[in-house]
Amino acid sequence: MRHRILMLLLGLAVLVTAGCGFNLRGTTQVPPELQKLLLESSDPYGPLTRAIRQQLRLSNVTIVDDPMRKDLPALRIIGSSENQDTVSIFRNGVTAEYQLVLHVQAQVLIPGHDIYPIRVNIFRTFFDNPLTALAKEAEAEVLRQEMRDQAAQQLVRKLLVVHAAEIKNAQENGDTLTSSKRATGAAKMADVEEINIGKPAVSTPAQ
């Protein structure tokens, strides 16, 4: 009986979270215009590209593996770099703490529109223990993978910023086009008025 009650409560919890739009942690509601795109990378099977691909799929984005498609938006990974800086040292001068930095540069290409550059910087602090060299290397690799995953999440989130900028540009172009049409119409009306003013008055013969 207790088992049935627990199962019922669990089912209700699932329904409630589904009804309120609950999403998995780290996922992003990508706009429909960007839910199908190309993923371009010079290292398509590298750990960073794999993390980005996984994050896109978690966000319900369909990745089209056809570079000949020019009608779809594209997320292009320009490059990435990792730096390691010393933050603190022991009394004997040996490094005690590092800061790991991951820089990622990318672009979003919208067909027939603009190219939007994206930059992501991820920081992590790593404590160096010279007595546990093997554990240190394993921990550093775990941190680097976490940084790649976080960079992938931020890249996908910035698709929302790109979409907002695209809407703003479309509105501004529409306003500019409307203003241009109005100016053209006013100029035509002025030409018509000038022509009418320049015409001599036509007199009607008296009967």
From Swiss-Prot:
Gene Ontology biological process terms from the UniProt entry: Gram-negative-bacterium-type cell outer membrane assembly; lipopolysaccharide transport
PROSITE patterns: PROKAR_LIPOPROTEIN
Residues lipid-modified (N-palmitoyl cysteine): C20
Stored Gene3D superfamilies: Lipoprotein like domain
Subunit structure, interactors included: Component of the lipopolysaccharide transport and assembly complex. Interacts with LptD.
Cellular component GO terms held in the UniProt record: cell outer membrane; transporter complex
Lipid attachment points (S-diacylglycerol cysteine): C20
Taxonomic placement: Bacteria, Pseudomonadati, Pseudomonadota, Gammaproteobacteria, Enterobacterales
Location in the cell: Cell outer membrane
Signal peptide: 1-19
Main location: membrane
Organism of origin: Yersinia enterocolitica serotype O:8 / biotype 1B (strain NCTC 13174 / 8081)
Annotated keywords: Cell outer membrane, Lipoprotein, Membrane, Palmitate, Signal
Protein name per Swiss-Prot or TrEMBL: LPS-assembly lipoprotein LptE
